[in-house]
Amino acid sequence: MVLSLALLLITACAVNYPTPLASLKINTMVTLPDELAETSGLFCEEEGMVSLNDSGNTPLIFHVNYQGEVTKRTRLALTNKDWEAITADPDFYYIADVGNNKGKREQVEIHKVNRRNVNDIKTITLKYAGNNADSNIPYAHDFDSEAMVKLDNKLLLFSKSWRTGITHIYDVNEAEPLQTLSPFASIEGLPGVVTGVDFDELQQRFVITGYKSDPFGNFATFLAQVSKAFL
């Protein structure tokens, strides 16, 4: 299934984008502290935000209030190979150790952390159908992901598709400790690679963020709204 979308752009530098379909107004902005300088995932709930840092950093979940202050740090008995996303439900945190820009990982992981006992961690090991780490070209393959969201009973992973630009959506089975993923839906027409996703409960649609870059190191970010019709 190919999804429809509405595109909003936050543009910068010299990267060319298609004309946006809607405007975007920022009402509130929160500055994260320096210890989250390499933040790669963010999940928001009523009482505050939770975040984490990118690959190689200490395996911590940071609890942050809406003034941008860290109120708690939770260390996990894990290794941060390449953490890229965090989402949650009332019972669990889900940490996506799925970064694979260079395409050299044969398998990636999602850690399911009990919110009431963070020492209770279950790891889901994932392989992508068709992935061959020996033949992937760095930054030119589709077996990478940086966006994840938990919606109802579904844990959804969105690809960072360097090669085709077509975003693949995977439904992760939490009951299977080892599984091979094939996409059940895709999104065409996004102007760049996807790095974040959340679900807008009020509007009943997905909100996707990402960026486009050029060979000269220029970056421009985008935000897109996507129908949930594929669920």
Located regions from the model:
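C-terminal motif of bacterial Sec signal peptides marking the signal peptidase cleavage site
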Residues: 11-12
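Sec-dependent signal peptide recognition
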Residues: 1-6
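Sequence/structural signature of beta-propeller domains
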Residues: 15-231
